[in-house]
Amino acid sequence: MRTYLDLLQHVLDHGVDRDDRTGTGTRSAFGYQMRFDLEEGFPVLTTKKLHLRSIIHELLWFLKGDTNIAYLKENGVTIWDEWADENGDLGPVYGYQWRSWPAPDGRHIDQIANLLKMLHTNPQSRRLIVSAWNPALVDEMALPPCHCLFQFYVANGRLSCQLYQRSADIFLGVPFNIASYALLTMMIAQVTGLKPGEFIHTLGDAHIYSNHFEQARLQLTRTPKKLPVMHINPDVKDLFAFRFEDFRLDGYEADPTIKAPIAV
């Protein structure tokens, strides 16, 4: 994925060194966009191997509306461990906002169910939006949403998705986010009778942590390989019925993982 490597290079070359919440320090650029045509292959990094199991299970966890890490732990996924409390709870994070956004009148709004309904009844709508950024509850979240708003767009029978990510940890987080939202787009396309279109990833504060510079430069020495193909069980017609076993990635050849510390 040359597109991703171009982002790494851009921030290393043109970013501004800044302090940050974690005390680690970053090199950051504000405002950047990447586009991935999902017909050209599944956009997962080939210049370092990603843990696809974590990506899929996290997405299924979001779609369940779950905010406790028990499901993730049961499936060997540890990416949320650092932020959970002693009971495994994270507060009203992504899954809660996606599936149970609290309204002032006491109702809870299932944004994903509403999105699916609109895609069936009014696919030309400009309101095909899901937001995880709830100002009233941000302070109760273990980690406020980094990928905070996404919008869908239907044209010529193809479903495209644009994600706005306010805070983008380029080396560790962004590769997961690309694959996760590409997969979500493919899943929603299948259950709404559409074909996958583009995934557009718009970044706000796009940063590389100072203790990731060496790893980023190593990754830039590697040559991207052909993208793999994601196969989704065609029998699944209900977005909330997908299981891990319904996904198969064929042809994924990647360079070895590059370890880097997480900034908490």
UniProtKB/Swiss-Prot annotation:
Pathway given in the UniProt record: Pyrimidine metabolism; dTTP biosynthesis
Binding positions for (6R)-5,10-methylene-5,6,7,8-tetrahydrofolate per the UniProt entry: H51, D169, A263
SUPFAM superfamilies membership: Thymidylate synthase/dCMP hydroxymethylase
Enzyme nomenclature, EC number: 2.1.1.45
Catalytic activity: dUMP + (6R)-5,10-methylene-5,6,7,8-tetrahydrofolate = 7,8-dihydrofolate + dTMP
Residues of the active site: C146 (nucleophile)
EC top class, as a word: transferase
Keywords carried by this UniProt record: Cytoplasm, Methyltransferase, Nucleotide biosynthesis, Transferase
Domain of life: Bacteria
Location within or outside the cell: Cytoplasm
Gene Ontology MF term list: thymidylate synthase activity
Major site of localization recorded for this protein: cytoplasm
Biological process terms in GO annotation: dTMP biosynthetic process; dTTP biosynthetic process; methylation
PROSITE patterns hit by this protein: THYMIDYLATE_SYNTHASE
CC terms in the record's Gene Ontology section: cytosol
Subunit relationships: Homodimer.
Similarity comment text for this entry: Belongs to the thymidylate synthase family. Bacterial-type ThyA subfamily.
Name of the protein this chain belongs to: Thymidylate synthase
Taxonomic source organism: Brucella ovis (strain ATCC 25840 / 63/290 / NCTC 10512)
Name of the gene encoding the protein in the UniProt record: thyA
